[in-house]
Amino acid sequence: MSEAVRVPSPATPLVVAAPAPEERKGKESEREKLPPIVSAGAGATAGLDRGAKGQISTFSSFISAVSPKKEAAENRSSPAHLVFPNIKNVREPPPICLDVRQKQRTSMDASSSEMKAPVLPEPILPIQPKTVKDFQEDVEKVKSSGDWKAVHDFYLTTFDSFPELNAAFKKDATASFNTIEDSGINAKFVNAVYDTLLNTPQDVQKTVLKGIINSLLREWKGPRTKDDLRAYFILLQNPQFNNTSTYVIYAHLLRQIATLVEADHHFLVHWFKKLSQKRFKQLVERLLQFISLRLFPAKPEEFPPITKCSWWIPSAAKVLALLNTANNLVHPPLIPYTDFYNSTLDHIDLMEEYHTWQNFGNSHRFSFCQYPFVISVAAKKIIIQRDSEQQMINIARQSLVDKVSRRQRPDMNILFLNMKVRRTHLVSDSLDELTRKRADLKKKLKVTFVGEAGLDMGGLTKEWFLLLIRQIFHPDYGMFTYHKDSHCHWFSSFKCDNYSEFRLVGILMGLAVYNSITLDIRFPPCCYKKLLSPPIIPSDQNIPVGICNVTVDDLCQIMPELAHGLSELLSHEGNVEEDFYSTFQVFQEEFGIIKSYNLKPGGDKISVTNQNRKEYVQLYTDFLLNKSIYKQFAAFYYGFHSVCASNALMLLRPEEVEILVCGSPDLDMHALQRSTQYDGYAKTDLTIKYFWDVVLGFPLDLQKKLLHFTTGSDRVPVGGMADLNFKISKNETSTNCLPVAHTCFNQLCLPPYKSKKDLKQKLIIGISNSEGFGLE
């Protein structure tokens, strides 16, 4: 390992705030007891031990689920049709299932194509009864004749067994289709049959459900063939499972899929990723709905007692994990990762879920924390904050006990992280204070500016963050380079003797998360991926931190021009060696001096050719994003994790860490209007009406400037606009004056302008020229 990528020794200031080796070792041994955060490649049975696996005790109730007394329920609008709102503004790890939690997650791509599982001989299938065209013609005939017999007979035969399902929907009944890339299913035919099903008479729909019951009973035991997997794949898409009256059947289908072996899950995952976006999203929404209505049933009497079906939710969560992994294997994903959030979970006891997960070694109980992709970022923030609060309370309690045991008078200041800094020496004072008080980093933060009166009720803390961030990220400071093309900062590769200020930035980000402060920082997504590599500080100091697999796409988020050039090199159809005349040596300017670096031993003598260009691009990208800034980023990493040393970080995706630190880029000005408070104005006053007419009509860039002008950031906290506590105050000055913002209190002081035109003009001038005016 070269010097550039060596982990700093324990004697360096980088790890001064990290836990002691003995403490880390103890914590690491505790974390080994945690259940793995489930990926589709993992075992299928997590949490399924709540219910009996050897028998299907509730299948006897299947028939009652489709009996005539349920017809009214099937016809009316069911709670199962509600659509859960996605938490917007918010790729596990890709962030969750692919590469961020290396110890907990398994990429499906890492598995071999056949998983080395024995391929069972496929049974001889019945003769395929109809084609898509035949089925559609039968449906058309019904419109004129009203006779459903042909359609009824088709559904009766098709859903009677797994072989019949394959006979109906397999592209070629004689072909095996034992590959992960092609399920062999005629998707168009499946979609046509299911789209028609909900418009058929009730007796046809009951016939299908009874056929599924028979199929599941018949196929409950024994090894699975690929035809069995195809049948599960087809049945899972049945839209009848939107109705709560079918949930008993649906639950047993989910359990059979969840308990398949890993090799079978591997096939299903790759088949799922071939679904259309519409059908894929329907599967996800149906499963989320199933979990929500099992947790909070509109009519509890529709379901078996929870004690007899405690395996329902674990089974659904496991199948969701398969879909989540499939989604992460597609670039871009079929649906946004936020579509997997289940907002219903925001209303359960999240800390109980978290503690169950933490204590898994003792209880082996199911916890949603094993499936963090269904937990919204807002819910994860609650878990992190409450976990940190508990840590703060424990530290403060120990401090009080120590004081009392020494017969010293307790000082309430020991409950806080008290920062005393001079404005003229902001960075050095802050660094000194945080270094001296590294044991107090998890306490509530309070800031005092030396020589200034006033209590910190939140405003001074926010001002300290804003001033410090602006100073550290200023180009003249030299720690970070601002890339105009990508509008983001990246770590300077300049070598120095002390990287403690990078540790300070990491601590600031950690404190911001724990103290609910939104920072005006612009790092690329790659930064947060590195920050979770690994999500917990390793006990072995020799293990590199902040190193992750990077691609040209990651580089494009920082240096788009260079990334474009490397992409052209990869796609060049001519002779790369003659046309580009490059070697495995790169150059960087440091303080006006050009320095050369070999990407591999003897790189200056190795030409880039058509054969090795992929290696060159990978090494160059890795050099820029990992090796050349290793010491800087390691200091930053240790700083962040010295504050955020919590297992809760294992629940987060890189994008979610960014949202916790910087807020969401998606604005909802109507929500801001609803939550705004007024001082000196009423929301019915003419000036206020003018203000909102103007602001709601602003283009997005001006709305962001307004938010930045009034709050110090153009992003929204995790809790939404309401968490800003935005206030408009009446400024009793001349209407010739511009609006004034008290950034630390998210307050806008607005003169009583007499016309909308005047207000718009003054507001645009104010928000467009606020840089350099300083904080008020």
From Swiss-Prot:
One of its GO terms (cellular component) is cytosol. Residues 21-34 have a biased composition (Basic and acidic residues). The active site is at 744 (glycyl thioester intermediate). Disulfide bonds: none annotated. Its EC number is 2.3.2.26. Pathway: Protein modification; protein ubiquitination. InterPro entries: E3A/B/C-like (IPR044611), HECT_dom (IPR000569), Hect_E3_ubiquitin_ligase (IPR035983). Keywords: Phosphoprotein, Transferase, Ubl conjugation pathway. The keyword Transferase applies. The modification Phosphoserine is found at residue 9. Residues 437-776 form the HECT domain. Residues 1-46 are annotated as: Disordered. GO terms for biological process: protein polyubiquitination. GO terms for molecular function: ubiquitin protein ligase activity. Residues 7-20 have a biased composition (Low complexity). It comes from the Eukaryota. It is an enzyme of class 2 (transferase). It catalyses: S-ubiquitinyl-[E2 ubiquitin-conjugating enzyme]-L-cysteine + [acceptor protein]-L-lysine = [E2 ubiquitin-conjugating enzyme]-L-cysteine + N(6)-ubiquitinyl-[acceptor protein]-L-lysine. E3 ubiquitin-protein ligase which accepts ubiquitin from an E2 ubiquitin-conjugating enzyme in the form of a thioester and then directly transfers the ubiquitin to targeted substrates. This is Probable E3 ubiquitin-protein ligase HECTD2. The lineage of its organism: Eukaryota, Metazoa, Chordata, Craniata, Vertebrata.
